[in-house]
Amino acid sequence: MEPAAAATVQRLPELGREDRASAPAAAAAAAAAAAAAAAALAAAAGGGRSPEPALTPAAPSGGNGSGSGAREEAPGEAPPGPLPGRAGGAGRRRRRGAPQPIAGGAAPVPGAGGGANSLLLRRGRLKRNLSAAAAAASSSSSSSAAAASHSPGAAGLPASCSASASLCTRSLDRKTLLLKHRQTLQLQPSDRDWVRHQLQRGCVHVFDRHMASTYLRPVLCTLDTTAGEVAARLLQLGHKGGGVVKVLGQGPGAAAAREPAEPPPEAGPRLAPPEPRDSEVPPARSAPGAFGGPPRAPPADLPLPVGGPGGWSRRASPAPSDSSPGEPFVGGPVSSPRAPRPVVSDTESFSLSPSAESVSDRLDPYSSGGGSSSSSEELEADAASAPTGVPGQPRRPGHPAQPLPLPQTASSPQPQQKAPRAIDSPGGAVREGSCEEKAAAAVAPGGLQSTPGRSGVTAEKAPPPPPPPTLYVQLHGETTRRLEAEEKPLQIQNDYLFQLGFGELWRVQEEGMDSEIGCLIRFYAGKPHSTGSSERIQLSGMYNVRKGKMQLPVNRWTRRQVILCGTCLIVSSVKDSLTGKMHVLPLIGGKVEEVKKHQHCLAFSSSGPQSQTYYICFDTFTEYLRWLRQVSKVASQRISSVDLSCCSLEHLPANLFYSQDLTHLNLKQNFLRQNPSLPAARGLNELQRFTKLKSLNLSNNHLGDFPLAVCSIPTLAELNVSCNALRSVPAAVGVMHNLQTFLLDGNFLQSLPAELENMKQLSYLGLSFNEFTDIPEVLEKLTAVDKLCMSGNCVETLRLQALRKMPHIKHVDLRLNVIRKLIADEVDFLQHVTQLDLRDNKLGDLDAMIFNNIEVLHCERNQLVTLDICGYFLKALYASSNELVQLDVYPVPNYLSYMDVSRNRLENVPEWVCESRKLEVLDIGHNQICELPARLFCNSSLRKLLAGHNQLARLPERLERTSVEVLDVQHNQLLELPPNLLMKADSLRFLNASANKLESLPPATLSEETNSILQELYLTNNSLTDKCVPLLTGHPHLKILHMAYNRLQSFPASKMAKLEELEEIDLSGNKLKAIPTTIMNCRRMHTVIAHSNCIEVFPEVMQLPEIKCVDLSCNELSEVTLPENLPPKLQELDLTGNPRLVLDHKTLELLNNIRCFKIDQPSTGDASGAPAVWSHGYTEASGVKNKLCVAALSVNNFCDNREALYGVFDGDRNVEVPYLLQCTMSDILAEELQKTKNEEEYMVNTFIVMQRKLGTAGQKLGGAAVLCHIKHDPVDPGGSFTLTSANVGKCQTVLCRNGKPLPLSRSYIMSCEEELKRIKQHKAIITEDGKVNGVTESTRILGYTFLHPSVVPRPHVQSVLLTPQDEFFILGSKGLWDSLSVEEAVEAVRNVPDALAAAKKLCTLAQSYGCHDSISAVVVQLSVTEDSFCCCELSAGGAVPPPSPGIFPPSVNMVIKDRPSDGLGVPSSSSGMASEISSELSTSEMSSEVGSTASDEPPPGALSENSPAYPSEQRCMLHPICLSNSFQRQLSSATFSSAFSDNGLDSDDEEPIEGVFTNGSRVEVEVDIHCSRAKEKEKQQHLLQVPAEASDEGIVISANEDEPGLPRKADFSAVGTIGRRRANGSVAPQERSHNVIEVATDAPLRKPGGYFAAPAQPDPDDQFIIPPELEEEVKEIMKHHQEQQQQQQPPPPPQLQPQLPRHYQLDQLPDYYDTPL
């Protein structure tokens, strides 16, 4: 009978709130059954026989607990507001006294009603009325955590475990969590205006567990509002819906905040911060954040609260939400002696949209790491929470609460009951026991014993009064800290945002009003479930389970609830989840094995002679891996070891002391502190009870003072108290005689006590990242310590005398100090020091001869010019990144095996290097070495020689046999390799000779047989020809071949056939017309890269079985030949940059199945035109394990076609962060541009807001980013373009100006002195590889929020004005700039005309130079001229210039829409797609002679010296000024329609015109644009006075020129336009020559079919050609003709000359441009 009743109770939460209210009889029956079952099971559990379930009866209706979603209405109490998502009638007032079920449990009723069957029969009918929106009010997910104390639990599990089982499952499944409906109270404009009125105000978002469903409630407060005031206010509201809450507090600034504030005059966003008053000083950025500052004493211990005197109780008066709207509420709890009474008021207007899902829910859908959950539904009753009853609601006596036994785990051998809820006198409140921390699976013994009685529960002893309520704060999804009552939440939030990088308080204020901030900083009203639960549920879900042996056919697979709790596996015995008996399988000492016969199946077995086995089959491979990894860790644990790290502990959990035999205890990253107010059972003083403890980890807590209790543990051998803000070490530590490892890193220590000398067994003492200025003298007595670890301190002078007194010290680590010199007081040698680490100091020279036994020396990244070392026992020398010109080692180091002296200024290899007989690795790269000694190659032990980036002109001519396996001689000046190099170096496996001047290769053998084992050959960027290809066949084992950017014209098929083991080939940047078909013999080939060639036929690469990547971009492919089935491993195919390529629908459909398929988008009439001022190309390449961890962003028409945005993002080893940045960052920048126009401000804010947008992905992962924004300022009188670059990490931007690189980015790493100082202040640990906490080298990067505040997202920002001297700029990822210098990158792409080909070249060069990471490169070519700024005046009256250059017209329609009525649209030439109107925008003519093109010769100077210097003015692209030495060919495929032509001719009647292609309805014009560019403005001449030089064909003159004497009418409405627009849309007059290309004042009319009205085309016979011999005479006639025109033009009025000088120039412009070709 009990299971049936329990099953009935379990089904109750599935009903909607309205449905349950309509079935009181059924609910009563279920409640009666539940009560009977609970009594029986509780009696069984009380005997302690087995951990079977004990069900708790429902709470009294008068006081449903903190999780109850339904309640009764008190007399005179206003009904709760309609909550979103409720079923119909959810806001309806219920009659008083109506029984109501509790979420997750049964509703108590006075008497038993009908049976449970009636409810089951109606279940199907009632279920139809449920909707997804009702989840907040009816489903168990909305109140399971809050109703944990009322709902029936499972066997051996507390109620909260039962309630959160489904939550824990959902937290591992994003798709399920994204379907959750969690409402968020939205801020209204009036609320935001109230906050913006004063800088002292703000908003914090609090997850409020007191509401019927957990909401993210906005709380408006001031900087003086305390956490206690906010918590008290939320507690008073309780289950009432309410809206946005105002809590003004009692501070000095609260009085001003209470004054009614008139709304600001502007309704839109503020573009500038308001001027703060004197009292409104922004908080200091260095102020301690939520976790900073000295540790404060927490409140008294968290006792189990009960009602009674001194306890917190509810007022019987109406709650503040019951008062009339707008009426301020002044009040608080009646018995609140500790918390001040806040002045609070509810905002009148608030929104509860049923469909309004929290933004943080969308971006932060699943719980974060560190054991903390981001779900607001997983909140548990806090120990400091107030009474769970509702104000003014009567209590119904009776129904005592029963305790819940807990499952027995390895750390909790004895189950213990929770403290019961106590019910005081009528009208009192119902109290609930607090939950223990995540530390255990049971509660401490000695809890209160409850006795059922008529009037409730009688406590044997009166508990102490509970502490006042307060808030919890969580940073970046990790541990959660309890705020003290006097702490100020808004101040904590502001300090955190200032540390991120926001610079203004008003901007911090705006950011705080965004609910998405929860992934960075989050407040809770009540302790989050995962940090306050008494069990440790790690994984759970519903899976197919089978018990016993797999061979037995009796045991079948059944669907069961499975939970990994602590160190036990819990499996339910019935289908209804946790209602039946729970089977507990201890995993410590057990094993987990994979079951190969079943997919995604694991076998879990316990240890011992009576071990049991459970087979669990998971649904997905992801779940399978998650369970395998987690359970494997649990099974490998020891019983004597406890790990309670990252559990948000403020004191020691009571159940920790069950086992006194612990040997290893890990308590790192909690909030433990020295607090004398804590009782003895909870403080750190109780650590001495562990008499067998050997290892104790207390790092990253808030100790503040050294815990003296640990000194009383005699067996302690390892103690870690790092990062605890310790300022001194007490003398009592001297009694720990057995201590061997003592870690004190990351504190504020300046000295050590002398008593440390008593630690005779101490062998390791960590003193790194403290504040020592010298070596402590006490180390002289610690004779067992052999390593001095003092990195990251403040040592300026190293006194060797101190080391001389420590003969036991062998390893000295003094990196990251500020050592400038070494002082040797005596001549004696320091014979005991064998390893010396002086990296990242400020040494100018180093004489290490005194260390005559030195074996390993680290001195990288100093300022060394000379270095002297004793070589007797030297084994490894690391001296890179200095300024060495001299390196002496004496005597010859016979034991030296590794030597790195790269990135110095050495001009030759020291002679002693050739005599080091055991040298294996020599790195001399990035020096100034001109020659390598021949004896170096004779060293029989040398295996790896890195000599790249030097000035080598040749290698030793005749080499003897050498043992070198890796030879890198890239970036030198080699003209050839030694002829016998490849024959003598029979051990050579790797050769990189890229970036030299090689024209030939040495042979590998002189016969047909070869001994070559060469596997990798890199010859990129040389001058190799086809003659070198046959020599490659001498290397039959070749696997990787890079011969990009050479002079290859063919690759013989017979030679390719012999390279059968080839796996990767790169032949890009040559002149190949085909890839040989014999490539099919290379059956192992997986990568073929051949972009930037002349390949016309698609190679047979699709026949290769292992092919993964094919890059044939920037070729001349016209078709693609594919097999019926694509290769199974093909992942990437790049066919961009093939303009002749045409793919049919079937081929496209087949290729779209490839994971990464790239092809040019077809140009359409409505396609967006590419910029006339800039064009771009980008590429990406996979790195290690074929993972593409980079992404590129390119927006040509950013912000309404007036700007451009480009970006590169690098995730290092993760894929998720770069893609998030790519998809989100442009939208954020567009929003920030609406708030401020300052380049640095909107760029900085964009990066910081992106940190928030990363959500939980950015909590543990990160990525570098660079963003470039091109902006045109219409207000600027110069009309210039501004390029703004912002970067974090190692992604960088470089601008090419006048052929020279101009870096616009900066990498913030440990070599930056200011960054290193900041990192040291935050006491972060920098590992030996230069990474913050071993994670990242960059101190400014997006993501990695768990490293805050050491790592921040504030970028480096730099802005430059673009000039005509700016050619292009490059954006690159880390892999690109690690392989190429900025000078080489600029030089490599400067002569590449196509941006896509330029980006491809950079990527190929980086890969050939040794980069193995993912690479992304974006090349943006610029064409910024004086005429690009569009500052033309539109009328003689001084009209305002157009708002923007409008250089991105995606179509003619948009040009018409955006153009002023009296102005002109600005043209655009397409980069990658054709522009519809580019033929109208040309500023030159096309020759009518057959086969003739525009002359490439620059035009001569002007014929008239008196002509005005028009080019001095800035003009738009439609009104160009041709300067000298500039030629640009622009291919236009403009489409027109001849339907509206009025020339009286049919298309068939016209003679064909060369250069103009037409089919009667389309006209394609090929245009040659001459636009000159002068370096000196005074030498510039106007286009009309610059006729072209005579060509061989002669000069073309229009036959219908206007008569010289006819005056011309100036048209200011269309300045520079040739003729008037006709009704049919044509522009040029009919009598003009067809080679005159005009500019339309208005775009041609568009037909419905999508074509344009074509202008009339004159016949070629209307013009004549002047022979070359008459050119000079014609020039004189033209000159005379033009002079007469200028004389006839009247000058402007005198009064307009000084004010409108540019108008005068515009008046002189002719009506058309006719440049004779």
UniProtKB/Swiss-Prot annotation:
Cofactor note (record): Binds 2 manganese ions per subunit. Mn(2+) is inhibitory below pH 8 and activating above pH 8.
Protein name: PH domain leucine-rich repeat-containing protein phosphatase 1
Main location: cytoplasm
Superkingdom classification of source: Eukaryota
Region Disordered, annotated ranges: 1-25, 41-118, 136-156, 252-470, 1458-1510, 1673-1717
Catalytic activity, EC: 3.1.3.16
Keyword line: Acetylation, Apoptosis, Cell membrane, Cytoplasm, Hydrolase, Leucine-rich repeat, Manganese, Membrane, Metal-binding, Nucleus, Phosphoprotein, Protein phosphatase, Repeat, Tumor suppressor
PROSITE patterns: LRR, PH_DOMAIN, PPM_2
EC class of the enzyme, as a word: hydrolase
UniProt keyword Phosphoprotein, yes or no: yes
Biased composition regions of type Polar residues, renumbered to the chain: 346-358, 408-417
Chain positions found as Phosphoserine: S317, S412
PH domain location: 536-636
Motif (PDZ-binding): 1715-1717
UniProt GO molecular function: metal ion binding; protein serine/threonine phosphatase activity
Subcellular location: Cytoplasm; Membrane; Nucleus
Cofactor: Mn(2+)
Skewed-composition ranges (Low complexity): 98-110, 313-325, 333-345, 1468-1489
SUBUNIT field: Interacts with the nucleotide free form of K-Ras (KRAS) via its LRR repeats. Interacts with AKT2, AKT3, PRKCB isoform beta-II, STK4, RPS6KB1, RAF1. Isoform 1 (predominantly) and isoform 2 interact with BRAP. Interacts with FKBP5; FKBP5 acts as a scaffold for PHLPP1 and Akt. Interacts with SCRIB; SCRIB acts as a scaffold for PHLPP1 and Akt. Interacts with NHERF1; NHERF1 scaffolds a heterotrimeric complex with PTEN at the plasma membrane. Interacts with WDR48 and USP12.
Ranges: LRR repeats: 638-659, 661-682, 692-712, 715-736, 738-760, 761-783, 784-804, 808-831, 832-853, 873-894, 895-916, 918-939, 941-962, 963-984, 987-1008, 1013-1033, 1037-1058, 1061-1082, 1084-1105, 1106-1127, 1129-1150
CC per GO annotation: cytoplasm; cytosol; nucleus; plasma membrane
Domain PPM-type phosphatase residue range list: 1175-1422
PANTHER family: LEUCINE-RICH REPEAT-CONTAINING PROTEIN, PTHR48051
Region (Interaction with NHERF1): 1076-1205
Catalytic reaction annotation: O-phospho-L-seryl-[protein] + H2O = L-seryl-[protein] + phosphate; O-phospho-L-threonyl-[protein] + H2O = L-threonyl-[protein] + phosphate
